[in-house]
């Protein structure tokens, strides 16, 4: 599930201007490219505040639980929303911006990933951080690659569903990842004061 958030973060700038602002490959030309840029920029504003919010939430409620339920599933909803909102509601900037909030919160909910890798390999933290950087780079590459390879065969909707399925699979994968997080047991449950004593 490493850095799955990068799939849409780097894949959507490839396909969404075509989908939302042209009629190519089944696009609907609902918005101008400048409007898409505003939607996408708004999503990045949300991630700035989301990074701070989720950093605190992850420390309080568990890194993996946060990424599993909020990171992966908000990204599923936000990804599919970017495709289906124009299909059903046309050029509705309010709904698209609301979806950008969901997607931005989902992407930023992966913020504990930088702590998870070193926690999984506490004896090899340098190598763990290198592996994290490699995973980030690969998903930065695979997001646009998925879009480029699949768009001509399964269209914009198919690409969005592919991303969404990857997020759903990532959610399942997190069930088998158990980093040591201070204040939590190996299953990701908070250790109470009574249990510590």
Say what each PLM segment does:
Residues 73-90:
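C-terminal ends and interior cores of transmembrane alpha-helices
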Residues 50-63, 151:
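Helix-to-loop junctions at the C-terminal end of transmembrane segments
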Residues 147-167:
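A membrane-interface helix-boundary motif in multi-pass transporters
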Residues 108-121:
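Intracellular juxtamembrane helix-capping segments at the cytosolic ends
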């Amino acid at each position: 599930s490493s850095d799955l958030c990068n799939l849409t973060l780097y894949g959507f700038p490839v396909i969404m201007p075509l989908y939302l602002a042209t009629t190519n490959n089944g696009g609907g030309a609902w918005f101008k490219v400048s409007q898409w840029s505003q939607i996408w920029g708004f999503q990045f504003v949300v991630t700035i505040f989301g990074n701070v919010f989720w950093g605190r939430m992850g420390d309080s409620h568990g890194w993996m639980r946060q990424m599993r339920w909020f990171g992966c599933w908000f990204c599923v909803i936000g990804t599919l929303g970017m495709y289906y909102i124009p299909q059903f509601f046309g050029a509705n900037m309010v709904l698209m911006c609301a979806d950008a909030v969901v997607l931005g919160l989902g992407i930023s909910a992966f913020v504990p990933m930088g702590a998870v890798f070193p926690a999984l390999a506490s004896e090899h933290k340098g190598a763990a951080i290198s592996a994290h950087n490699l995973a980030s780079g690969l998903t930065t590459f695979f997001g646009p690659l998925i879009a480029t390879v699949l768009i001509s065969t399964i269209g914009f909707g198919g690409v969005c569903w592919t991303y969404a399925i990857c997020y759903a699979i990532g959610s399942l994968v997190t069930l088998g990842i158990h980093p040591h997080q201070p204040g939590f047991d190996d299953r990701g449950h908070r250790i109470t004061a009574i249990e510590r004593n």
